[in-house]
UniProtKB/Swiss-Prot annotation:
Gene Ontology BP terms: cell wall organization; root hair cell development
Keyword Glycosyltransferase assigned: yes
Organism expressing this protein natively: Arabidopsis thaliana (Mouse-ear cress)
Membrane topology: Single-pass type II membrane protein
Name of the gene encoding the protein in the UniProt record: RRA3
Main location: Golgi
Protein name, per record: Arabinosyltransferase RRA3
One Gene Ontology cellular component annotation held by this UniProt entry: trans-Golgi network
InterPro entries xref list: Nucl-diP-sugar_transferase (IPR005069), Nucleotide-diphossugar_trans (IPR029044), RRA1/2/3 (IPR044290)
Residues carrying sugar: 40, 277
TM region(s), chain numbering: 16-36
Length: 428
């Protein structure tokens, strides 16, 4: 009996010991997981302050000394700073994730726009995509302009010319040629009141922009080149509204409807400043450097520039990006808009520079004729003079623009065979 009692007492003692150990263990776990108690930090601090006051009242300063309170406050500040840093890191990671998802979404949208993936066909049958999808029109950009374009545009296309009082005489010749051909989708962007009144008198569709200090200053007083540079800012809204735009300088005579001669397979379709097949359409120019010996000949690809006074833009993202790039550079430096226009179109991507990925086409140089081709080549060649009737003639190579424009009308419209003869090839 005594042995059983002893064993029973030992067993009871073991259970008590185990219970104590479990309690200590749970207490340690709770101390680690909840160092400031089961309530929030503010409640803990209030409780700590309350206990501190109580302990001071009962004289138990040894348990909650001022040093202990300072240490707890210091720990709280440290943890708060760490928490703020973690929140900052979370925000940064969230932003990076958002940007990554945005980039992925853009890539997905581009794939959807271009179509599903396909396998390459047999040799000689593969053709790359050069016609980018058009944008979704946004009439909220400019409701007033949208209404005008809706009334005059044909198949969502329009000819646009910018003009101020300085080019009145040339504009009158151009308007007469437009009416003679029967083009109805022609719009003048009037840069001053004088041109606005001229358009009203001649029953020509016009658009006058809302007041803009930067544009108005150049538009009302600027010369030919200054006004020409404005088009890259003005045309953006036309594209955003979903219209194909054929930009025309005022020193151009229309002899046929140009819309019947466009291909519309590229973002940019422009006339050339070239005067023959090589200069207009490109050629391999060999650079000779004798000092290099065996490697003295270096091949270079050359083409004369696209003319920024007559070009067609489809309403695509690359076309709008082209306008943005050129307008941005023109706003920062005094440079020629035609030079910038071509640099953005032709310079390839390289370190520190990402090129514009716009498809481009050069127009037929005899249909969309510059004045060098006309006065230096065509008028001196009997066959060309007889057979070639251009769509437009752009008097871009000569300063006596008005006289030559009138001569073009006399020759091609009125049939006066010697109308072009009195002019020199170039300028005197």
């Amino acid at each position: 009996m005594a042995g059983r009692r002893d064993r029973s007492q030992q067993l009871r003692g073991s259970r008590i010991a185990i219970a104590i150990l479990i309690g200590i263990f749970i207490g340690c776990v709770c101390a680690v997981l909840f160092p400031y108690g089961f309530f929030n930090s503010s409640s803990s601090l209030k409780a700590s302050e309350h206990l501190s006051k109580s302990s001071n009242q009962v004289g138990s300063s040894a348990c909650e000394s001022p040093e202990r309170v300072k240490m707890l406050k210091s720990d709280f500040v440290t943890l708060s700073e760490k928490n703020a840093e973690l929140k900052k890191q979370v925000r940064e990671l969230t932003e990076k994730l958002r940007l990554a998802e945005q980039g992925s979404d853009n890539a997905r949208k581009q794939v959807l726009a271009l179509g599903t993936q396909i396998k390459a066909g047999p040799f000689g049958t593969v053709k790359s995509l050069r016609t980018n999808p058009t944008i979704l029109p946004d009439e909220s950009i400019n409701p007033r302009l949208a209404k005008i374009l809706e009334e005059i545009a044909v198949d969502k296309e329009v000819i646009v010319a910018l003009a101020n009082a300085n080019v009145k005489a040339m504009l009158e010749v151009q308007i007469a040629s437009i009416k003679r051909v029967g083009i109805t989708n022609y719009l003048v962007v009037a840069l001053d009141d004088y041109i606005e009144n001229l358009c009203k008198e001649n029953d020509v569709a016009y658009y006058k922009r809302d007041p803009d200090k930067d544009v108005d200053t150049v538009g009302k007083t600027g010369g030919n080149h200054a006004v020409s540079g404005l088009k890259f800012r003005v045309l953006r809204e036309f594209l955003q509204l979903g219209y194909g735009v054929l930009l025309s300088d005022v020193d151009i005579v229309f002899l046929q409807n140009p819309f019947s001669h466009l291909y519309r397979d590229s973002d940019v379709e422009s006339m050339s400043d070239g005067h023959d097949n090589h200069t207009a359409y490109g050629f391999n120019d060999v650079f000779d450097e004798p000092a290099m010996g065996w490697a003295r000949y270096a091949h270079t690809m050359r083409i004369w520039v696209f003319n920024s006074g007559f070009f067609y833009l489809r309403p695509t993202i690359p076309s709008i990006e082209l306008l943005d790039r050129v307008a941005d550079r023109l706003s920062k430096a005094k440079v020629w808009d035609q030079a910038v226009f071509n640099e953005e179109l032709f310079y390839p991507s390289h370190p520190e520079y990402t090129a514009l990925h716009a498809s481009k086409r050069v127009m037929d140089m005899y249909e969309f004729m510059n004045s060098k081709v006309l006065f230096k080549t065509v008028r001196k060649n009997h066959e060309l003079k007889k057979k070639v009737k251009p769509v437009i003639v752009h008097v871009n190579y000569h300063p006596d623009k008005l006289n030559r424009m009138q001569a073009v009308v006399e020759f091609y419209v009125n049939g006066k065979q010697d109308a072009l003869d009195s002019f020199p090839d170039g300028s005197e």
